[in-house]
Amino acid sequence: MKARFLLITFVLLQALLLASCGAGGRVGALQSESQSVDLADVEAVSVKIDFGAGDLRVTGGAEKLLEADFTFNVDKLEPAVTYKDGALVVAQPDRRGVPNFLGILNFRNEWDLHLYDEVPMDLTLDVGAGTSNLDLSGLALRRLNFKLGAGESAVDLSGDWERDLVANIDSGAANLTVLLPSNVGVRIIVDRGATLINASGLTKDENVYTNAAYGKSDVTLTLGLQTGIGWVNLEVEDSAAANEYSVTE
């Protein structure tokens, strides 16, 4: 099963890497650039990240709405950043076509995105393939939609949430780890395919997983999880706060 998954993932990853470079894409000199977006006078923002393939990192801690570093060696992978009326889009413009296959061996596409912590945010991510590390624990998220094609991803939703969060993760041929909070209620509804699920620190009732704080805290994180093939690791963060909701005999 594991060998079959790795083979399928490899094939899908290569296909998505090829498609992500666009028609006629060629590996060239390594380029690095930084971009930032100021936060306008808005009460909330929507952020959409459209990433074809490579290595993606998203976290908080920015002084502006966005502080980003991009590294790539295919011209067609140069990202486009737009912002208007509270809507931020960071996108790889051309994800179609098949480039020179030989160049794919030296393919590099790396995005390091820092977002502002304090503004309420609806976040949408569409990731084709590769590795993604999403540390969202410090953001003021209201909604999260994450679509992952193939590869590996770690999503950190731990921390002290001050408002309810509605999240959805849809993964294809991927290995996914989700770190969950211990001191706010968590409810996960799973619609899975040929996926192995490890749920540490959660209680299972058919296709629903909950943590010890569910139904007892003022804030609830609700996660819908759709999976294809691969494995999913659901972990509740280690915290002394978890003991507050633990039942002792």
Language model features: what each stretch is:
Residues 94-113, 124-126:
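A cross-kingdom signal targeting lumenal/periplasmic-facing segments of multi-pass membrane
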Residues 1-8:
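Bacterial N-terminal signal peptides that target proteins for export
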Residues 8-16:
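Hydrophobic helical h-region of N-terminal Sec-dependent signal peptides
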Residues 116-120, 126-129, 136-143, 147-150, ...:
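Extended beta-solenoid/beta-helix repeat architectures
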